[in-house]
Amino acid sequence: MLRVNIVGIGPGNPKLLTGAALEAINQSTILIGDKRMLANFASEKRFYDTIKTAEICNICANANPEKDIVSILVSGDVGFFSLAKTISGKLPDCECVRFCGISSLVYFAQQLQMSWDDAKIISMHGRRQNFIEAVAHNEKVFALTGGENSPQALCAKLCRFGLGGVQVYVGENLSYDNENISSMKAKEAAQKQFSSLSVMMIINKDAKTLAHNVHGLNDDLFMRSKVPMTKQEIRAVSISKLMPQETDVIYDIGAGTGSCSIELALQAKRGMVYAFERNPEAVQLIEKNKELFGVENLTVIAGEASEKLEEMPVPDCVFIGGSGGNLCKMLDTIYAKNVNCRVVINAITVETLIEVVEYYKQHESYALDIVNVFAARAKKLGAYNLMMSQNPVYIMTALKKGE
């Protein structure tokens, strides 16, 4: 069986290699990694300049188990947002051994003379993360950057969400001769250019504890206008029925003020919410509430939802607060994308109730649950409190039978 070492080389400077990692590299006949990593090692070995999984697997398949030892060099530590996880799962016929390295987080914290055990850690390098939420609700955030998520781009995003005053430390080319560490406000960093090999530490002294952990936020927390809004009590029941998961792709059709969209985005922190709305005034309001709550995992889709659904990503669950008269057509499109999609439909008219019931009579593989919610709020009138009723709402939940 071919021996494959997966070696964490730290931030890059060979002086920071562990003794065990250096020994594993020295014993190897084949080294695989990018050009920057390979440059520090002896030329008598066979070098392969690649970090593509398919190419690495092919090299290992053609190696001689009797003569060769392969070392795959990965940056940082093998357990910290590393290629090691992907590679080891693709080499079942090899003996894979991991060697730890110094991660960029550990090295950068050392250079800043700062502890890191209290930091929120996120990777923006080829990943989708709710960066704004992390910074808004954590005093210290460490971020790996890369690609379109450069330090300047991330700081520009902070500025758009009202966080331009947070303190930012940027570490460029860590451990190399041209290492540079700078400190400034996010609004200043947004105007600068940084190396493609950069990490960030963000300090937000005004971080707010994330209290949005229940369904049914107070209506007064949202920016409002004459645009219809799903009230707190109805929202609480509807979202509970929808059962959003942290990584879900969610549609909110007929989003109105965006109150449901906001709550869903807060629940699906590592997912994405698409708010469909045809009213231009409501579209602007959703954008304002998006900025107010700092939910960047919310995308507003302006126009008729029935005309937009085909091009959208596959949904895990869908909330329909308004259909524009195209309810059955939209449900057909949704189920064509995902037959197991969880669907919650709110209605205030008997006609919509009948339409939904008739639809699911024709689609017997789904179980339809109907709840009619009556809510009333107290209103002060002199020395008395009068209960003022809201419109009753039918909350209809459709789940695939057996789910």
How should each PLM-predicted stretch be described?
Residues 2-8, 19, 50, 68-70, ...:
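A contiguous loop/helix-start segment that scaffolds small-molecule binding in enzyme catalytic cores
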Residues 13, 76-138, 306, 364-386, ...:
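Class I SAM-dependent methyltransferase SAM-binding "motif I" and its flanking Rossmann-like core
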Residues 247-256:
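Conserved class I S-adenosyl-L-methionine
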Residues 266-273, 337-339:
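Conserved S-adenosyl-L-methionine
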Residues 286-287:
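Conserved SAM-binding loop
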Residues 335-389:
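C-terminal substrate-binding/active-site "lid" region of AdoMet-derived donor-dependent transferases
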